[in-house]
């Protein structure tokens, strides 16, 4: 048999107005119907003396059948991570430019996973192999197969997420764009548009003028998002007066 990483719950998950320079870097990791490893992978660099070229030594995590291909032009210079990644977010070929601190070993530069669902299928296969369950067919992601080819499904295990207040805590405290986008898609049952409508309906029912906000995503990474100061003030006032909203929201602030 084979393992299928089913990512079909979400529709297109990269908001249309995210810029090309963001969608390959760690903060631009888009949601997936089957997210895994926070939809990011690490390139482990070794840097030398100031001005020398840094080299990629390893990747974590790795796929079982597909290898990353990284065109790297990273210089050992400065005191901070100033490396940036470009390329097709769904491709295993990446371009990395910029600089990282000199004289480092296993220095981590993060980028977006090309296919989180396939990696999840790979890692599940590895775990099954370790306990003696052997699979003789290559893994797939549901993006590449027709749903009709899956004849039947049997629920074998359910894993529950942390409660919503804990997810919100991490989202706000760490400014986690991936979590914010995933929450929006969950509200919209896989659709960015329907998620935005759900947010607007929530505040409209509480008396706010939703014509004062224009949302294109859940995190604010897109540059077209706009909100008036009046809407923000009224929203915070509503949260403050609602004990169910105020406690988890206030706890989540840095």
Predicted regions and their residues:
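A small/polar active-site loop signature that marks catalytic segments
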Residues: 75-250
């Amino acid at each position: 048999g084979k393992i299928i990483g089913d990512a079909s719950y979400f529709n297109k998950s990269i908001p249309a107005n995210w810029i090309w320079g963001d969608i390959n870097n760690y903060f631009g990791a888009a949601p997936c119907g089957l997210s895994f490893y926070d939809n990011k992978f690490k390139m482990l660099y070794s840097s030398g003396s100031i001005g020398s070229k840094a080299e990629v030594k390893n990747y974590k995590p790795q796929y079982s059948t597909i290898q990353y291909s990284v065109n790297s032009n990273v210089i050992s210079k400065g005191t901070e991570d100033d490396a940036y990644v470009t390329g097709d977010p769904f491709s295993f070929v990446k371009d990395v430019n910029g600089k990282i601190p000199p004289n480092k070993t296993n220095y981590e530069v993060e980028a977006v996973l090309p296919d989180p669902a396939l990696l999840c299928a790979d890692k599940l296969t590895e775990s099954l192999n370790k306990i003696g369950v052997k699979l003789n067919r290559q893994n797939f992601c549901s993006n590449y197969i027709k749903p009709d080819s899956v004849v039947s499904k049997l629920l074998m295990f359910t894993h529950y997420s942390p409660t919503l207040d804990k997810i919100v805590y991490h989202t706000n405290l760490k400014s986690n764009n991936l979590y914010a986008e995933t929450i929006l898609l969950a509200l919209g049952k896989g659709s960015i548009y329907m998620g935005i409508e759900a947010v607007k309906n929530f505040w409209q029912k509480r008396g706010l003028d939703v014509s004062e906000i224009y949302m294109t995503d859940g995190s604010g990474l897109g540059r077209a998002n706009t909100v008036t100061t009046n809407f923000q003030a009224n929203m915070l006032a509503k949260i403050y007066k609602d004990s169910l909203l105020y406690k988890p929201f206030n706890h989540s602030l840095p």
